């Protein structure tokens, strides 16, 4: 994955994790998963609800937070 992709994903997912924001994650096959982001890395997201699920990022279509989240992206690194 490109570094630019990580510049957007990491701050967004980290804000959702730190603020314990409930999310809906839509997979490319249309399935909707709900829970809180427990952790993430370059390839997977750990989603916690009644159980913890490891969701591969390549299977994720959309991440929808239950509320607005402020996250900082370093503009100086984008070009």
From Swiss-Prot:
Name the GO cellular-component terms.
cytosol
Q: Which Gene3D superfamilies match?
A: 2.30.30.100
Q: What are the residue boundaries of the Sm domain, all occurrences included?
A: 10-69
Sorted alphabetically, which Pfam families does this protein's record hold?
Answer: Hfq
GO terms (molecular function) for this protein are: RNA binding
Q: Which InterPro entries match?
A: Hfq (IPR005001), LSM_dom_sf (IPR010920), Sm (IPR047575)
Q: Name one GO biological process term.
A: regulation of DNA-templated transcription
HAMAP family hit by this protein: Hfq
> Which family does the similarity line name?
Belongs to the Hfq family.
What is the purpose of this protein?
Answer: RNA chaperone that binds small regulatory RNA (sRNAs) and mRNAs to facilitate mRNA translational regulation in response to envelope stress, environmental stress and changes in metabolite concentrations. Also binds with high specificity to tRNAs.
Q: What is this protein called?
A: RNA-binding protein Hfq
């Amino acid at each position: 994955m490109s570094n630019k992709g990580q510049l957007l994903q990491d701050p967004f997912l980290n804000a959702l994790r730190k603020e314990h924001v409930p999310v809906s994650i839509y997979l490319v096959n249309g399935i909707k998963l709900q829970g809180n982001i427990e952790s993430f890395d370059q390839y997977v997201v750990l989603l916690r609800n009644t159980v913890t699920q490891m969701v591969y990022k390549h299977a994720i279509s959309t991440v929808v937070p239950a509320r607005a989240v402020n996250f900082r992206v370093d503009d100086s690194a984008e070009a």
